[in-house]
Amino acid sequence: MQGPWVLLLLGLRLQLSLGIIPVEEENPDFWNRQAAEALGAAKKLQPAQTAAKNLIIFLGDGMGVSTVTAARILKGQKKDKLGPETFLAMDRFPYVALSKTYSVDKHVPDSGATATAYLCGVKGNFQTIGLSAAARFNQCNTTRGNEVISVMNRAKKAGKSVGVVTTTRVQHASPAGAYAHTVNRNWYSDADVPASARQEGCQDIATQLISNMDIDVILGGGRKYMFPMGTPDPEYPDDYSQGGTRLDGKNLVQEWLAKHQGARYVWNRTELLQASLDPSVTHLMGLFEPGDMKYEIHRDSTLDPSLMEMTEAALLLLSRNPRGFFLFVEGGRIDHGHHESRAYRALTETIMFDDAIERAGQLTSEEDTLSLVTADHSHVFSFGGYPLRGSSIFGLAPGKARDRKAYTVLLYGNGPGYVLKDGARPDVTESESGSPEYRQQSAVPLDGETHAGEDVAVFARGPQAHLVHGVQEQTFIAHVMAFAACLEPYTACDLAPRAGTTDAAHPGPSVVPALLPLLAGTLLLLGTATAP
């Protein structure tokens, strides 16, 4: 049918005639010059053969390649650009690879099995965490003896400080991969663990958070799993459903505080910023919601810190250790937006995640810090329909579908966006599709949209980043980190310390000077805002 193609060509002619597309892009010299500059930069790349003092892994939960592309366009359009020519912070990382995300038992994985792969270096089974594939989902008696050790745990044993930052609950599958061993990723609190499993000795994830290893910084959501049943939540005291859930009567926050003389617990943004500036604070736990943290578009900026602010606070504390640090940073609600088939939520979460990556890059040095950005898995999220460049990423394709109705350029293969109106697919308008609450249409009706099984990108910068190349198993990521920092099982890595130091554990440039003006200014504003 010629109709859609004719409309597309007419639209393109109109777009060019209106001057939307930069006129210089019509000249081949523009593209040749751009490519020559990129080639020149590539020729200057020199692998950093030194050891990494610090390790940061940024995990975009559910951030497949289509999500990265769409978020890049959205970030540009928010700055009044056409979109695709924009660079995300992660795009600037010089080394890129693809990661195969399958679990031992599934083509398409969950976040528990993938966390085991990229944090522990071993593939496991669907919905298990920190266990080899010899462990079976929901079978407590297969836990013991099948535990695998995370890079974060190895970093702690090597004398480094370690931290976990996430926009989900801190007991969620991705961050739990750094410290927990469980046959069921949903065992957040002891109330979620069957009595039979508790009798067999299986611990809930919240208990493991404070008992399995000494984590210096813990920031995210998940308050309700740390307190006894009936404990009112400080932010929602009248909502019983948001209060403590524990059946064992334990106050895990108090138990954690008692372990460390310099420990501090906070539950709002003001307390976080104050604690991060206090030199007496050696350990910091911040739990800012009963469950997952709010989406960025719903965040109360007076109470809830952004992912970037949590990352800054974590870096401020962790960088005090002259032996270096390991930091896990997760943009966890990208995944949740996709499961809801709400692309607006997923993409704005991706941009917030990218902002945290950019800020961390400003506060650390690639001379001594290996930074990796990746996803645990993708989603059945597509971007197509021949939209005109510069048109809204949330807009409509220029042509109609065979049912003579409009369709959006962003769609899902399955999910809750499958809706029938009078027995047919409903028409959609530009104003509807641009709403933050809009669910993109799906081909198959499901209560929740599913993960996808294609490879995901890995971006790398810093010492040993050149090892990130080609198409690799997801487990390779953990091994690159361990080798770069000379952690088990690569303690005999034979890597030289970075220039200007006598050993790889020597302190490098501190993030403290860069952070102090920002945090002090923020606290001053907060004090002014709350003054009577």
Curated annotation (Swiss-Prot):
Chain positions covered by the region annotation Disordered: 422-443
Anything else known: In most mammals there are four different isozymes: placental (ALPP), germ cell (ALPG), intestinal (ALPI) and tissue non-specific (liver/bone/kidney) (ALPL/TNAP).
Keyword Magnesium: yes
One Gene Ontology term of the molecular function aspect: metal ion binding
Stated name of the protein: Alkaline phosphatase, germ cell type
Organ and tissue specificity: Trace amounts in the testis and thymus, and in elevated amounts in germ cell tumors.
Keywords: Calcium, Cell membrane, Disulfide bond, Glycoprotein, GPI-anchor, Hydrolase, Lipoprotein, Magnesium, Membrane, Metal-binding, Signal, Zinc
Residues annotated for Zn(2+) 2 binding in this entry: 335, 339, 451
CDD domains: ALP
EC number annotated for this UniProt entry: 3.1.3.1
Binding residue positions for Mg(2+): 61, 174, 330
Binding-site residues, Zn(2+) 1: 61, 111, 376-377
Signal peptide stretch: 1-19
PANTHER family: ALKALINE PHOSPHATASE, ALKALINE PHOSPHATASE, GERM CELL TYPE
Residue sites binding Ca(2+) per the record: 235, 288-289, 304
